[in-house]
């Protein structure tokens, strides 16, 4: 993952909404959605819950 994708994925894994992530990182919600699509594909996950599980397993 790119640095930006890691930041977005980390905030989503913490339970933040796309709107909250966008506000925290000064991005548009569309940018967050696009990045999450790439993150899901790269990690082979299909949901926010799977993403959170993936991050929990790594830490």
Over which residues does each language-model region extend?
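Helix-turn-helix DNA-binding segment
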Residues: 1-37, 41-59
């Amino acid at each position: 993952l790119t640095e930006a994708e890691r930041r977005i994925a980390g905030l989503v894994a913490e339970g933040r909404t796309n709107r909250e992530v966008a506000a925290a990182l000064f991005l548009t919600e569309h940018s967050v959605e696009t990045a999450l699509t790439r993150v899901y594909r790269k990690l082979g996950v299909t949901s926010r819950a799977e993403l959170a599980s993936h991050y929990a397993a790594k830490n």
